[in-house]
Each structure stands twice: as C-alpha cells, then as structure tokens.
C-alpha cells in the first residue's frame, strides 16, 4: 500500500539525520558550554516559531497540488502565488527578528560577557527565516504529488547538514555565532536541493500573484495558522520562560529530555504527512472513511 510505503520513507527522513544530530549536539553542548548551547536550542525554536509567517501555505499548497495534480495552468498559479507571498512575508519576519534581536537577548537573562556574541547570532539567525520557509513550501509541492521518496532523500541530506554543519563550524571557533553561521549555510544548501528538485515548476510558474488562487490558499491556510501559532507556543515557550526565570544555562539541561519526548511523535507525523495528499484528492465518502481509519489505526498499532 502506497500509504505505508510513503510513511516508511517519511520515517527514514526523520531517523537518518538523528544519527548525526545526537553526537553533533552532544559535542556542541560540551564545546559551547551550558549557556551558549541553551541559547542555541532557543535559536532553533525561534526559527521553528517563524512558521507563523507561513500562514498555513505549506499545508495549503500540498492540498492544492494534490487536487490540481493534472491541471498544469492551475499548478503554476498555485506555486507562483504561494512563493511570491511567502517570500515577502518571511522577509518581514526576518526583519522583525533583526530589529528586536537585542530585546530578545535581554529577555533571555544571559550573562553580560556573552551578550555581543548572542546578539550578533540572533541577527544572523534572522537570515535563515525566509530560507527555511521557502524550503518548506517547495518541498510541499513534492508532497502534494506524493513523491515521498524524493522528499525524504532531500530531507535526509538537508537535515544531516543542518545537524552536522553547526558542530563542524564550532570545531574551528567555539562561539554561538559560528554555530549559527553553520546553521545558515546548511539551510542554504537545503534550499538549493529543494530548488533543484522542483526547479522546472518554479521557473515555469512565472512568479506572478494570482488573486483568485491566493484567496483560495489563504482561506484554507488561515485555519492552519491558528495551529501554527498555538502549537510552537506549547512546544517551545517553556524554554524562553526557563531562560528568563532561571538563566539560559538551565535550558541546556532541559532541552535534551524535552527533545527525546518530542521524538515520540515521529510515527504519527510520518503517517499524517503521507495520508494528507490522499485525503485532499479523495473523491468518495467511502474512500475518505477508509483513509481516515488508516490514519487512526496505523500510528496506534505499535503502541498496542
């Protein structure tokens, strides 16, 4: 069954980078020290929370591509409208992080000796936000076409770079700025790989905003935006609060167990990403019912 096959590909995309991430993060924790490593995990959270600037377009474009899979003209409008809007909005998000970087750093309750390094790091981090969101958007095109093999080969390479490159930079210069520079380079590599996979569709789309298509994307994506705001807040805000109340060094000790628990969601996430395009283009109620039952039963089977 294609759902199971695609779910396995999604699991591979999660598991392989973890084999690099675990030792890489361990080395960075040792090299940077508790405070700077704690801030690094918060920096990762900032990029993740930047998903609010996605406006639900990643899920919307997966759905739309699945629905209009055989309509070349409409696909071009979908890709162009989503890319143009998201590039503008994510650039605004990056600018906001640049402008308020000093305020963010003050809130994190760090030692004065590390202020310059951390402040410069957050300014550099702001550049990763448009890159991160565009990458997510372009990969969503492949997900809409159910090309999960290509998606997860890209994810495996990209996430391995994202996990390992910061540690590599820290080997040569043990500062947070070096770690964020490594993160930025790895995000650029990830975006380039995504572009190569969908370059023909991006180039041929014409990069023009179509208002009718855009309204349809936003109407669906707007509901997901609510989840994009609430979910990261529930997952990441505890780190900001711990840093503010106890100091950034305590975040390093908290993040490890927290991330381990978060990994328990890998299996349902893998199945969910595989089944979403099928649900989007399912034409009959019986088909929807069958896919929904699979969605519910597959992630729970290993636990039973």
Predicted regions: what they are:
Residues 2-3, 149, 176-179, 192-235, ...:
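Interhelical loop/hinge segments that connect adjacent transmembrane helices in multipass membrane
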Residues 123, 152-200, 258-261:
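Hydrophobic alpha-helical transmembrane segments
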Residues 1-21, 73-76, 80-81, 118, ...:
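N-terminal membrane topogenesis motif
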Residues 55-70, 143-144, 203, 261-293, ...:
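Helix-loop junctions and terminal segments of transmembrane helices
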Residues 99, 112-138, 189, 301:
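Alpha-helical transmembrane segments of multi-pass membrane proteins
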Residues 80-109, 164-172, 192, 268, ...:
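Alpha-helical transmembrane segments of multi-pass membrane transport and lipid-handling proteins
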Residues 2-59, 90, 94-98, 128, ...:
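Signature of the first transmembrane helix
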Residues 4, 41, 73-88, 122, ...:
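Interfacial transmembrane-helix starts/ends
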């Amino acid at each position: 069954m294609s759902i199971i096959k695609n779910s396995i590909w999604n699991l591979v995309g999660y598991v392989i980078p973890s084999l690099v991430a675990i030792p890489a993060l361990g080395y960075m924790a040792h090299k940077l020290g508790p405070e700077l490593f704690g801030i690094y995990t918060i920096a990762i959270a900032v990029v993740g929370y930047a998903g609010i600037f996605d406006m639900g377009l990643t899920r919307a474009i997966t759905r739309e591509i699945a629905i209009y899979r055989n309509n070349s003209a409409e696909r071009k409008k979908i890709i162009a409208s989503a890319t143009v809007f998201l590039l503008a909005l994510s650039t605004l998000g990056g600018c906001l992080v640049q402008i308020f970087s000093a305020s963010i750093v003050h809130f994190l309750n760090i030692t004065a000796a590390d202020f310059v390094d951390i402040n410069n790091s957050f300014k550099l981090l702001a550049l990763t936000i448009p890159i991160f969101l565009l990458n997510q958007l372009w990969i969503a095109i492949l997900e809409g076409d159910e090309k999960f093999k290509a998606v997860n080969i890209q994810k495996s390479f990209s996430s391995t770079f994202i996990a390992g490159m910061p540690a590599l930079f820290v080997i040569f210069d043990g500062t947070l700025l070096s770690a964020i520079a490594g993160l930025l380079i790895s995000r650029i590599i990830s975006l380039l790989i995504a572009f190569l996979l969908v370059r023909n569709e991006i180039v041929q789309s014409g990069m023009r905003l179509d208002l009718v298509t855009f309204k349809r994307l936003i109407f669906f994506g707007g509901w997901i935006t609510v989840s994009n705001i609430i979910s990261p807040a529930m997952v990441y805000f505890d780190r900001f609060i711990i840093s503010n109340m106890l100091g950034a060094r305590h975040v390093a000790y908290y993040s490890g167990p927290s991330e381990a628990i978060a990994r328990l969601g890998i299996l349902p996430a893998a199945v969910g990403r595989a089944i979403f395009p099928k649900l989007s283009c399912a034409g009959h109620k019986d088909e929807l019912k069958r896919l929904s039952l699979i969605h519910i039963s597959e992630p729970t089977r290993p636990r039973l």
